[in-house]
From Swiss-Prot:
Name this protein carries in UniProt: Nudix hydrolase 16, mitochondrial
Source species: Arabidopsis thaliana (Mouse-ear cress)
Residues that hold Mn(2+) 3 according to the record: E78, E82, E144
CDD domains reported for this sequence: NUDIX_DIPP2_like_Nudt4 (cd04666)
Family membership noted in the UniProt record: Belongs to the Nudix hydrolase family.
Underlying gene: NUDT16
Length: 180
């Protein structure tokens, strides 16, 4: 049984200029690049994607940013609720705009959304999480994730946001700490 409960409803949602504000993350980890586990060969980065609750394709965890939390808190919460992972929320990757047919409401009749995306270094995978009965999670290489992205804006967040950030910050040896 899962002690965590996913937030639901739109009463506490944030809106700005007719767009629903969303927070999300691209969870990542490093694995050995060879089958034998020989660390001398280096590490490969993998990103975690989740199944959609409304159709085919894979997604990164994201959801509404609510009035009682910061955008970083919302991104971390969505990672736990939708993907069942916790870790170190790293840098801001960018804002990505998209339209959502399922999130049209009185505050955003056109379904416009603006997602603030972050990198999340995964430290813990939970056995159960709030949406574990409706979502599956899958670790993928960057190339596999690009091919699997359900939404073009998420592909942009991965390629233009995450990959550029990783190359600039992580490949140059920045330490992973909780001080971001």
């Amino acid at each position: 049984m899962c002690d965590l409960v996913a937030r639901t409803g739109r009463l506490q949602q944030r809106y700005e200029d007719g767009s629903r504000l969303v927070a999300g993350c691209i969870p990542f980890r490093y694995v050995n690049s060879d089958k034998d586990g020989n660390s001398e060969s280096g590490k490969v980065i993998q990103v975690l994607m989740i199944s959609s609750s409304s159709g085919p394709g894979l997604l990164f965890p994201k959801g509404g940013w609510e009035n009682d939390e910061t955008v970083r808190e919302a991104a971390a919460r969505e990672a736990v609720e939708e993907a069942g992972v916790r870790g170190i929320l790293m840098d801001f990757l960018g804002n990505y705009e998209f339209k959502s047919k399922s999130h049209q409401d009185e505050f955003s009749p056109e379904g416009l959304c603006k997602a603030a995306m972050y990198a999340l270094y995964v430290k813990e995978e939970l056995a159960t999480w709030p949406e574990h009965e409706t979502r599956t999670r899958k670790w993928l290489t960057i190339e596999e994730a690009v091919e699997s992205c359900r939404h073009p804006w998420m592909k942009d967040a991965l390629v233009e946001g995450f990959c550029k950030w990783h190359k600039e910050k992580m490949v140059k040896g920045e330490e992973i700490t909780g001080e971001h």
